[in-house]
């Protein structure tokens, strides 16, 4: 995978010139976004349990019927699996922040998810609610910088859209 740095250097070299000011600004922007993604990944890692628990609770608050007998969240086992899945999505978002792309979400979270949930009779709306809560609870500068929050929210939106 080529980085912005290698792309800029290759283009300048092919043109027989030094990287221009705009080339260097592009590299600087890429480095700043990478730093913001790493900040968001670190903050999420440090708070994953709290974020996942709050997201799970928000999901159950919006869909209390899930706790009814025979529903998707009616036993302790189902509750644990739902909480585990929410935490799994958040972990994949953290991985995606680190790598700077949606690869981990695409490969380990999104591919085939609708079919699996449909086959198991699991609604996706509660997961959408949980991830939406995680998105809406973030606050700059309380939780992270504005740029880090932008990077984090973009990946949450990506996951939410894939489940919608």
UniProtKB/Swiss-Prot annotation:
(2R,3E)-phycoerythrobilin 2 binds at residue 139. Pfam families: Phycobilisome. InterPro entries: Globin-like_sf, Phycobilisome_asu/bsu, Phycobilisome_asu/bsu_sf. It is a peripheral membrane protein. It is found in: Cellular thylakoid membrane. GO terms for biological process: photosynthesis. The keyword Transport applies. Contains two covalently linked bilin chromophores. One of its GO terms (cellular component) is phycobilisome. It comes from the Bacteria. Its main location: membrane. Keywords: Antenna complex, Bile pigment, Chromophore, Electron transport, Membrane, Photosynthesis, Phycobilisome, Thylakoid, Transport. Transmembrane segments: none annotated. Induction: By green light but not by red light. Belongs to the phycobiliprotein family. PANTHER family: C-PHYCOCYANIN ALPHA SUBUNIT (PTHR34011:SF4), PHYCOBILISOME 32.1 KDA LINKER POLYPEPTIDE, PHYCOCYANIN-ASSOCIATED, ROD 2-RELATED (PTHR34011). Light-harvesting photosynthetic bile pigment-protein from the phycobiliprotein complex. Heterodimer of an alpha and a beta chain. This is C-phycoerythrin alpha chain.
């Amino acid at each position: 995978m080529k980085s912005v740095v290698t792309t800029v250097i290759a283009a300048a070299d092919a043109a027989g010139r030094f990287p221009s000011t705009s080339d260097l600004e592009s590299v600087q922007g890429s480095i700043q976004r990478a730093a913001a993604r790493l900040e968001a990944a670190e903050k999420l890692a440090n708070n994953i349990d709290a974020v996942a628990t709050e997201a799970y609770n928000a999901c159950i608050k919006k869909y209390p019927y899930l706790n009814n007998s025979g529903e998707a969240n009616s036993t302790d086992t189902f509750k644990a699996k739902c909480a585990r899945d929410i935490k799994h999505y958040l972990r994949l978002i953290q991985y995606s922040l680190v790598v700077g792309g949606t690869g981990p979400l695409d490969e380990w979270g999104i591919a085939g998810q609708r079919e699996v949930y449909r086959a198991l009779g699991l609604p996706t709306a509660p997961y959408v609610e949980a991830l939406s809560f995680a998105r809406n609870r973030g606050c700059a500068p309380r939780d992270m910088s504005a740029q880090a929050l932008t990077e984090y929210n973009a990946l949450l939106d990506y996951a939410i859209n894939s489940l919608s």
